[in-house]
Amino acid sequence: MVNIPKTRNTYCKGKGCRKHTIHKVTQYKSGRASLFAQGKRRYDRKQSGYGGQTKQVFHKKAKTTKKIVLKLECTVCKTKKQLPLKRCKHIELGGEKKQKGQALQF
């Protein structure tokens, strides 16, 4: 499990800032797929009517994790940027910090 603080002091390249400022950290989440994207319209048109599945359904999934992407929002000018991290299975935002010599708690 990766523990990431909810705020991060990093460079902001917004017009108002162009310096290091505090950024609010959230995890990126993909939006809902549009029904009106060209590929989706073409696919739906092809699928309609008789004839079953017309395009191959992908089954050979190779990866077990996804890359974590952080969304950073500047607290001064509200400029947003994304920061990809390494792959991990679990992510925790703003969890408690580990301390040396502490017993494990479950």
UniProtKB/Swiss-Prot annotation:
GO MF terms, alphabetically ordered: structural constituent of ribosome
UniProt KW 4Fe-4S keyword: no
SUPFAM superfamilies: Zn-binding ribosomal proteins (SSF57829)
Protein's UniProt keywords contain Phosphoprotein: no
Record-linked Pfam families: Ribosomal_L44
Gene Ontology, cellular component aspect: ribonucleoprotein complex; ribosome
InterPro entries (UniProt xref): Ribosomal_eL44 (IPR000552), Ribosomal_LSU_eL42 (IPR053708), Ribosomal_zn-bd (IPR011332)
Keywords attached to this entry: Antibiotic resistance, Cycloheximide resistance, Ribonucleoprotein, Ribosomal protein
BP-aspect Gene Ontology terms: response to antibiotic; response to cycloheximide; translation
Cross-referenced PROSITE patterns: RIBOSOMAL_L44E
Other known facts: Confers resistance to cycloheximide, an inhibitor of polypeptide elongation.
Family statement: Belongs to the eukaryotic ribosomal protein eL42 family.
Protein's recorded name: Large ribosomal subunit protein eL42Q
Natural source organism: Candida maltosa
Lineage of the species this protein comes from: Eukaryota, Fungi, Dikarya, Ascomycota, Saccharomycotina
